[in-house]
Amino acid sequence: MRWIAALLVLMLLMPAAGYAQENPVPGTGTCGREYCYWETPMDLSDPETIWNVLIQPMTVVKGKQRVQVQLMAQPSEDAEMVGEVTCDSQGVHVLETLENGWSLVECYSSSNKLSKLDVYGDLVKGYLPTEMLEERETKTRYGLVVDEMTQRMYVFEKGRLLTTLRVSTGKATQKAPQCGTTAGEFHLVSMVGNFISESGATCEHAIRFNDGDLLHGVPYYLEDNGKKNYSSCERHLGEKASEGCIRIQRKRTPEGVNMRWLWERLFDQMHTKLIIWQDVPGRRQPIPAEDTPVYVLPGLSNAYHSKPTCYDIDKIYFPMEEITYGQLEEEAYARLHNCGYCNPPLRVQEIEALNQRYAAVEE
């Protein structure tokens, strides 16, 4: 299963110093750089470090965007295949460069339903010819982080964490194990635009990051009266639901960000980096400090909010009333839900349940 290989990472490597939470790192080796996706704990406790990871160059396999190359168990074309990597967009972690013209790399396998292999999303190590590898520069205005544990996208701009968006990543099942979203580091490589899914839903503003896996807006079905119906997909934001693509909220955050905003800003920013953190045992989400401000509108809104203004609330009610995160436990606020526009932190009980779900397996 996908999480087994990542659990080995947890046992082999401890997180870097300075992180409040003992979260695992994606990779199993070192690359000799100060900032490296594969060696950085999977959490947001140090946004500056995450930003520096997002702007680093990335090693890719040369080739066409929709082609996979096989990794071999030994440095030989006749060896067993152990995984696959997508050309042009998927980053690999170079562990060793051999004198015989081969390199040992690791990545999350990008096998799909058309592949010869059924290694779906596992962290794998394998060999490929060194001449196939190329280091690519990364655009440095924006950076994106998708966390499969929280089902959130964290949008960075010019060194700062700008906003948080609700997403739905791929949902792998026993019948369709290829439908999970492959973790790793990627470059956005092409603007695809709108397309119709196999179920007949329209997906807008699609951007390619890993072969057939795209960033795109919440799918909608067109009703007979011409109205766009988002309800069947929008209600699943915040949980796994897609067939590999990453669905991104259409409702604007207080900063005005949604999938359309990303499409417009990233149109001339190909090779912006996207990193995807896998939801593996051993990961934890921090509980916000009790004095963290949140905002409410008693009697008029049944949600709590992250900012004093929100697109879910009419401007005549701005600014909303400020309370503390700790006060959400009081009876007056106990039934308020998390706003789907501005995405405030989950309640304590929800975070604790999430952490319990991904608690490391003990001996």
Model-predicted regions and their roles:
Residues 1-6:
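Positively charged n-region of N-terminal signal peptides that target proteins for export
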Residues 8-12:
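Hydrophobic core
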Residues 13-19:
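C-terminal segment of classical bacterial N-terminal signal peptides
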Residues 21-49, 54-59, 139, 179-183, ...:
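Exported/periplasmic cell-wall-interacting domains
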Residues 74-87, 310-319:
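SH3/SH3-like (including bacterial SH3b) beta-barrel domains
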Residues 106, 117-137, 265, 269-283:
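Short, structured interface segments
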Residues 118, 123-229:
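Gly/Pro-biased beta-strand-loop elements
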